[in-house]
Amino acid sequence: MIKVFLLIIGGAIGSALRFGVSTWMQRSMLYSFPFGILSVNVIGSFLIGFCWSIAEAYNFSINTRAFLFTGLFGGFTTFSSFALDTMVLMRTGEYKMALLNVLASNILGLIAVFLGIILGKNIITMIK
């Protein structure tokens, strides 16, 4: 039961953070491109990679992992918003922007996870 509670709390925090970061990023840009969702997905990918490397090194409990990876980062990043933004771009005839969104989200997300893992491992090496 505690794991479910941690998932709910983590998801609520992640969702609130996603709303704030996404809204702020989108307002900062003057283009129709969905920078808000792209930014939370890239930031979240980096953070999940970073936290995963720390969780592996320090054997985080199943409850802590549930809070972080399923709750917090699951609430912060979102595939459904990415898909909706892409479909809206396609429906309005902005096919190049839609393709750019798909490529940027996937490529930058993978790079961000990779960099997060490397940073986490380097920090752990420095600490030990």
UniProtKB/Swiss-Prot annotation:
Gene Ontology annotations for the cellular component aspect, listed alphabetically: plasma membrane
InterPro entries cross-referenced by the UniProt entry: FluC
Regulation: Na(+) is not transported, but it plays an essential structural role and its presence is essential for fluoride channel function.
Record's catalysed reaction(s): fluoride(in) = fluoride(out)
GO biological process: one example: cellular detoxification of fluoride
Membrane topology: Multi-pass membrane protein
One example GO MF annotation: fluoride channel activity
Residues the entry annotates as binding Na(+): 74, 77
Name of this chain's protein: Fluoride-specific ion channel FluC
Name of the encoding gene: fluC
